[in-house]
Structure formats: structure tokens, C-alpha cells
Amino acid sequence: MSGKLTHIDQTGAANMVDVGSKDETERQAVAEGAVRMKPETLALILEGNAAKGDVIGTARLAGIMAAKRTSDLIPLCHPLMLTKVAVEIEPDENLPGLRVRALARLKGRTGVEMEALTAASVTCLTIYDMAKAVDRHMEIGSIRVIEKSGGKSGDWAVSDPASMR
């Protein structure tokens, strides 16, 4: 990994990286996050009794939609033709709360880490929004990339996925 910031030019100004000369390769990234909540809140969500409706289904769709809009939210991200976005939401009674995993994939010239991170983040934010009326003490955290593949820098994965849980 290079120690150089690619979005900063020689004068220190932010710029969008020119990826036009890069080869198109299959690229994928997976990000995760978690929403910690009261056990009663988790039960309410899992039973489908939240006042705003289907929390898990709505949050999953919000994450997918967010990945597709990443370049509208993050100033120097390229608009990408994603070929796959998937969001998984799993209950974790030990947290207690919901764990989120988001995958983004494409064949292109730049990575999809930001799209995976955006999907995971917005999924967590949507869970919070839909359950905040019953639990204002929810906590969003552990949002990070846990694996990526493709591109010039090759494949990478967190060596201990549980290290930040």
C-alpha cells in the first residue's frame, strides 16, 4: 500500500483521481457495522412490531439504494456501474442488536469500498431511525471494510474479523 494520498494534488488541493488509464477488473468490497440496542428493542424489531413497519426489510433496501448514490454523497467518489449490492442484517443477542454486512461489486477501474461502507452506514442509520421512538440509547458502531478484492492492490481481508466487535 502506498503512503501517498491519491485525492490530494501536489499543491494540497483535493482532486478526483483520473482512473481512465486503469484496466477494468472485477472488484468487490465487504463492509460491516452494528447497531447496539436494548434487548426489548431487538425483540420488537424481530417480531415485526415496530411502529414504522418492517425495520430489517426497509433498512436493507436503504443500504442498497445508498450504495448506488455514493458519488452523490462523497465528493471525490466516481459514479460507478455497480453489478451487485447485497445487504445482510443478522440479530446478535450478545450485542444485543443487529449486525450489518454489505457487499458491493463491479467490473471497473476503481474500487467499491466506499459503496460498501455507505451501504453499511445507511443500513445502520435506517435501523436507528425506525426504532429511535422506543430506544434513544441505540449505538451505531464498528463500521469498517472487512475485505476487498480486485484492482492493482490485490485482495485484502481483516485478519481478525472479531477484533473490533
From Swiss-Prot:
Its EC number is 4.6.1.17. Pathway: Cofactor biosynthesis; molybdopterin biosynthesis. GO terms for biological process: Mo-molybdopterin cofactor biosynthetic process. CDD domains: MoaC_PE (cd01420). The keyword Repeat does not apply. Catalyzes the conversion of (8S)-3',8-cyclo-7,8-dihydroguanosine 5'-triphosphate to cyclic pyranopterin monophosphate (cPMP). It comes from Brucella melitensis biotype 2 (strain ATCC 23457). This is Cyclic pyranopterin monophosphate synthase. It is an enzyme of class 4 (lyase).
